Amino acid sequence: MNDIYTDIIGEGYPLVLVHGYFGSSNMWCNQKKTFSKHFKVITPSLPGYGESFKTKSLDNIKDMAKTIIKITKENNISKFHLMGHSMGGMIVQEIVKISPKIVDKLILFGTGSIGDIPGRFEPIDVSRERLKKDGVKSTANRIAKTWFVDGDKAKNFYLCEEAYQNVNQETGDCGLVAMKNWRGIENLKDINQETLIIWGNLDKAYNYEQVKTLNENIKNSRLEIINGCSHNAHLENIEEFNNLVLNFLGK
């Protein structure tokens, strides 16, 4: 656990942000700047990813969730707002399942409740095969291009390149296995937190059915759609994304 990088910035009520597959703490850089004016913002890099690339990766969502819970305990954070993106959205759903009382408001961004991700631009098994055949950097680059409307020409694509620079083959495969084997749809009815669901309408990883399922099954939830954005809406329309989150959190 000691090699897990966690950035903590700002003061006030804690807000924990959990990145997705091939992500890092720094993928939230455009959120940290804004949110830290109102909150204590905690952004870990998951084991094997980003700044935690030296830490052994995990191959299941539950262990990733337990890792985030442990980080909050180590930093004496007993209750917090929680946001997860993509695979991070699976992790935060699992955190709510394990320890519902520690989570205040919940934000599910570009994510779903079925780990195999029906409607994804390619099945997870295909990504695993391509990872084996093409290697980690080539696969990460190919996948990350789908996260932006403008592909690798997007202004903030470089953040993805930085994030996957040191990720190894094992971590790449572990993440895909973790997602494929996870399922949270049956637990949605038990989520009592006030929940904001954010989705870019051009997302190629998660289609509308996935976020609609979240919205219909989480009783106290609302869905906000950011038009003209893909999977990484927080890096494409930063202002609209940040405003949605701050308004939801009452700032």
Give the residues covered by each predicted segment.
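Catalytic histidine-centered segment of alpha/beta-hydrolase-like enzymes
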Residues: 229-238, 242
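Conserved HGGG/HGGXW glycine-rich cap/lid loop of the alpha/beta-hydrolase fold
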Residues: 4-54
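Flexible "cap/lid" loop of the alpha/beta hydrolase fold
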Residues: 93-98, 103-133, 138
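Active-site loop/oxyanion-hole signature of alpha/beta-hydrolase fold enzymes
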Residues: 33, 42-83, 243
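Conserved alpha/beta-hydrolase catalytic His-Asp/Glu region
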Residues: 116-122, 133-189
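Gly/Ala-rich beta-loop-alpha elbow adjacent to hydrolase catalytic centers
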Residues: 84, 88, 92
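Catalytic histidine neighborhood in serine/cysteine hydrolases
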Residues: 208, 212-232
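Short beta-strand/loop motif that positions the catalytic acidic residue
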Residues: 191, 197-199, 203
